[in-house]
Amino acid sequence: APSGGPLVQHALQALLDMVKAGKMTLEQLVQKSAHNTATLFQIEDRGYIREGYWADLVLVDLNKPYTVSKANILSKCGWSPFEGHTFSSTIEHTFVSGKLAFSNGQLIEKGAGERLLFNR
């Protein structure tokens, strides 16, 4: 059976919908999803936009709705509980370790990431 995390692809969009609904600020979203993760797991050189850190960035159009369909699911499992749901934002580009990994709905460079290093 194919594996894959069916929630991962749309996690940021789900959180951005919470921002739009006033449940948290954009700053809180960044704190909880990037900064706290890097700090909690003691991941070296990630989770912040700082000189010398890896550029893991997502560029989002906050005003462009995105509907999840079977055709645009990238997870290996091939399904999502969000299928048919329309999010208020669209992920335009994703950079992993400074390399363009996703652009305009398409994976660009498979395996663009670098091995994580931990301070523990």
Question: What does each model-identified segment do?
Answer:
Residues W54-L117:
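C-terminal cap of metal-dependent C-N hydrolases
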Residues A1-K64:
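His/Asp/Glu-enriched, well-ordered alpha-helical/loop segment
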Residues R120:
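A cross-kingdom feature strongest in bacterial/archaeal respiratory oxidoreductases
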